[in-house]
Amino acid sequence: SGITRICVSTGNIGQSSSFYCKYMRFAEIAKGSFDRESVKKLYKLDDSAAEYRMLKNSEQDCILQLIQFEKNTGRCIRDTANPWDYGYLDIAVQSSDNMKACLDFTAMGYKFFSTPTHYCADWINMDVSEGVMFGPDKLPIAMIQRLKEPIPKIDGYFGNMTDCAQVIRDMDQALKFYGDILGRKLVFDDTMPDGLVDPVVQVPYGTHSRLAMFLTPGYPVVELIHHSIEGTSLKETARPENLGIFATCFKTDDLDGTLQVCSSSGFDVIRESVVHELAPYGKIRSAWVNGPSDTIVEFFQTL
């Protein structure tokens, strides 16, 4: 499968769920909670219970998991980070009208990391407008509007998730992980023309940016971004107790086999497998792996 779940720590689960359901065509399909003992086993947090809600649109198989921990710090993972720092970056969505979205959400009090910018995405033969909004908990949401046919019909502001992006220290290592180990299909890998996406991603002039994409039909693209400018790892910040994307999850039919292959390839298991209940899947076994550029990647198997 592709990205089965995107895990987002939130400071106010009700407000966050309302935002995604109202503006991004998600529906709440399940919810649940973890007691303190479970949170310690699953998330390595002491003395903190948690509640979660599972959101999903009608066209994709990826779930957005919102989870609120009692002992969250209130600190946003990318609040003080540079956009070229290594770790999960944003969730991208189709947009019907970027300028209208920018005006309307600004009026609602939301801030923009970058206002809509037009560029020609030759790798998909598309003219696009792209801007990045800070959504709930300052989570970056990239809005991508197609300006050239085929233009999808979108009711409301936003459509499907297009990708979940991460900034990578070592592109070859990341390609090995998602391609060779996980067997995902690489559909794009190239260096962007200088300056093309600089206004969107806010990197210094003269930065060379390489982009790679892994596509699994029915799921958001795994988007990998490598910049020539050196960044800093967000490993110590991109933790469950801080707000934002802290993990992506993949379903497997053989958890032990997957963990063995990851470990033998240099991607260590950082949280051993635990059997637990998770709606809407029922009973599962899950474990964490230290993925490319120290990102948390969860693998789980339904039982």
Task: Kindly label every feature range from the protein language model.
Residues 9-61, 120, 124-126, 166-219, ...:
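Core segments of cupin and vicinal oxygen chelate
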Residues 32-51, 70-89, 99, 106-129, ...:
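A cross-kingdom feature marking solvent-exposed beta-strand/loop segments within repeated
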Residues 1-17, 30, 86-93, 142-175, ...:
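N-terminal beta-strand motif that seeds the catalytic metal site of vicinal oxygen chelate
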